[in-house]
């Protein structure tokens, strides 16, 4: 069946009315729980950081004790099936579906949608809101400090209601659209769960393969097994001649335990010459020294330049396999991160140079490299399965997500006009 005939059969001459959210839905703002009264146990609080764009993630949750407050917090309860939205900060506009059995409570700057169920299917609203995240962000003002007003949100976002004069028929159509879209989200959820399991397996085998008894290996500093360890630089911003060139220029936010085949920013020859940025060869192991990604590692698969926050390790292939070092430093992420100093917990080039790696059979380079290669072969299989965007589970998840978004936009793209009109 073609896409058009499918839509025609599903909608079958339906009329649609675009209604402001405030017409078909109520909204509840969160309560101002005091961070000074947060507990490590008690009743959970949903904060903006728990809204991940699809679900409510309670892996990092704070708690409260109701006896600490004079106010009655019962009306701020979040139950299974509730739809929440982040109202400010980096997650502004992100939607989260609460799927947990036990209730939680709504913190300030998190809002809860309360659809009028005689008119609007809860999951229909959820899928529609997922398609409007960018528009909601614009309503919030965008920029560095977005801040979403609940009144503006409820007034400016309009949702299509098919058969508005026939609630039963309308809900039937909405339920069918939900059934189709939920099929795709369930497939993605299954793949994501599989990916999580495979990552745990990778971590287990990595830790087993890279754990050595005393005397089995020789521990050497990175600067002992490298040709060169360098950092880069940043061409002066505001000088247009330095940017939008052809030289890949890596920033630390692009380092995430995987191969790096391209960069988000390119610089020019002039930018390279007039800064501390410099070319590095392919297959360096790169460690992020500053910022949110400090301690993360990656491998550049093309020659590129980097900023000054990258420690670029050009390893001596007569002594070590670069992917062996990559896997080992990945396993040491938490330790490397703990070496940071200052409010930003940064590390420096000297810390990176002094990091030690275990070299098996250090007195027999040929045997040592063979053992490293054996370990790498095993770990690379798991790494490909869990991180590759061209194959493996991440690729499959990406394809399923694109498929979901395609059908979501197809099913929810009703013709829009000022007046109610026929869809066919």
Model-derived features: positions:
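Charged, alpha-helix-forming regions
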Residues: 1-424
